Every structure is written in structure tokens, then in C-alpha cells.
Amino acid sequence: MTSEIPKPAKILGLLGLLPFLIALFSTINANLYFLLVSYFKININELQIIYSTIILCFMSGTYWGITSNAKNQDTLPYTLSILPTLYILGIHLYFDEYLLPLIGFGFILLIPIDIYFSKSKMAPKWWLLLRIPL
């Protein structure tokens, strides 16, 4: 297995940042904000919340796929794989008023899970090279 990030993973990973970047730049560029809100009817906070929720759940599915394909079929990898989904569900249910900062914290919490899957050799060798910058 190579340690070079496959081109499709790199390109699609970077494209996955677009909704985050659009939301970020719309907060510092009034014209972009006006275009998104008026023309496309996009609520920037909703864009961030919905897309971030999707990505955290996607990461759970990714971790589950890595785990189910590994030789190590212990409980810990499966438990770690569902944590992002349980986390996002919990903050949506109980901490709605702090949703955006807690979602941001959820992405930080992915880092130790990524490190675990990489160090345990369940994830591809290039995994952290892709995940940490994203």
C-alpha cells in the first residue's frame, strides 16, 4: 500500500471544503453574502450546520468502513466509528444554542480518531496526510 494520497481522494477532499469556504468568505465579503442570501436563498448559518452535520456523519461511515474491512474486529474501533454521529446527534438535541462552536469542536475531536486508525494500521498509510490538512 502506497503512502501517496490517491489523486481522487485529494481532489474530492479539497472540493469538500467548498461549502466551508463559501460560508467563511460570505462573512467577510458583503457582496458574496448578499448574493447567497438574496439570489440563492441560502442561510449561511444553516449551510454550516447542515453541511457540517453531513460531514461528521460521513466520517462515522468512513470509520465504520475502515473498521469493517480491518483484521482487528475489536469493539473499540467500532465504538470510535460511531462517536461522530452520536456527538452530532447529542448536540443537536441538547445544545442547540451552542451548535456552531460545538460542531467546530466535533471536527477537532476527529483528529484523535484519525490518529488511532492510522497508528493501528487500519487506515491507509496516506490517511493522516489527507485528513490533518482537511
Where are these regions (language model features)?
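Interfacial loop-to-transmembrane junctions
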Residues: 9, 116-134
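Transmembrane helix-loop-helix
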Residues: 92-112
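Membrane-interface helix termini and inter-helical loops of multi-pass transporters
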Residues: 29-42
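Non-cytosolic membrane-interface motifs at loop->transmembrane helix junctions
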Residues: 42-45, 76-77, 123-130
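Core segments of alpha-helical transmembrane spans in multipass integral membrane proteins
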Residues: 17-21, 46-93
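Helix-loop junctions at the membrane-solvent interface of multi-pass transporters
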Residues: 26-30, 91-95, 120
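The first (N-terminal) embedded transmembrane alpha-helix
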Residues: 8-30
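Short, Lys/Arg-rich, polar N-terminal cytosolic tail immediately upstream
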Residues: 1-5
